[in-house]
A protein has these predicted regions:
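Non-catalytic DNA-recognition/assembly elements of restriction-modification systems
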Residues: 1-15, 128-147, 154-170
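A short glycine-rich beta-alpha junction/loop motif
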Residues: 2, 12, 78-85, 115-137
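Sequence-specific dsDNA recognition surfaces
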Residues: 5-20, 27-57
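A short beta-sheet element
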Residues: 32, 51-103
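Short, solvent-exposed loop/turn positions at domain surfaces
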Residues: 48-49, 115, 154
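Short amphipathic beta-strand starts and helix->beta connectors
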Residues: 71, 112-115
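Histidine kinase transmitter module recognition
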Residues: 90, 101, 152-155, 159
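Short amphipathic alpha-helical signal-transduction/dimerization elements
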Residues: 102-110, 150
Length: 171
């Protein structure tokens, strides 16, 4: 078992001024919790911002409120907002393996987290989180297998959606 902070760096989001939130897409998108899973944002930020909070396509993000989702971001230039963090795998850690391991760990944390209105994931909890991390060659194999399975599942979901649409079109 290894602590999360020993296998990756964690960058926590910035507290952007909500007065500068806009729906004008000429500004950079602002990643909020609800955007993590879907990979895009319809909220933009018109103010000044620190450059270190600009994301790239493929960055690994975690939503820290409600459902604790982990997903890859899908576009360049978005801004990392508070209550969302970015995981950057350290040398010796396969980032896809990290994504799969964190998916399981986050669901377990979510399951055991008490809440009144919305569940919150703290930086303290992430910093002490421990994951089972095999050597890099095994991480690579596990990540490759799970990625292939994930693609098959996604393809099957698309097929089911097409069949569902076909049935609806007939009636």
């Amino acid at each position: 078992m290894k602590k999360l902070i020993d296998i990756c760096d964690i960058q926590y989001g910035y507290a952007f001024d909500s007065k500068c939130f806009t729906d004008d897409s000429c500004y950079p998108p602002l990643v909020r919790i609800r955007d993590v899973k879907r990979g895009y944002s319809e909220t933009y930020y018109s103010g000044d911002y620190p450059k270190e909070y600009v994301l790239a396509s493929g960055d690994l993000l975690v939503g820290m409120d409600g459902e604790f989702n982990i997903a890859r971001w899908k576009c360049d230039g978005a801004l990392l907002n508070q209550r969302v963090c970015k995981l950057i795998a350290k040398k010796g850690t396969n980032e896809e393996y990290l994504r799969f391991a964190m998916t399981k760990a986050l669901k377990e944390i979510e399951r055991r987290t008490a809440f009144v209105t919305v569940k919150h994931l703290s930086a303290k909890e992430l910093n002490k989180l421990q994951l089972s991390v095999p050597d890099l060659s095994k991480q690579n194999r596990v990540a490759e297998i799970l990625s292939r399975l994930e693609k098959v599942i996604d393809f099957r979901r698309q097929e089911l959606q097409k069949l569902d649409n076909l049935i609806k079109a007939r009636f």
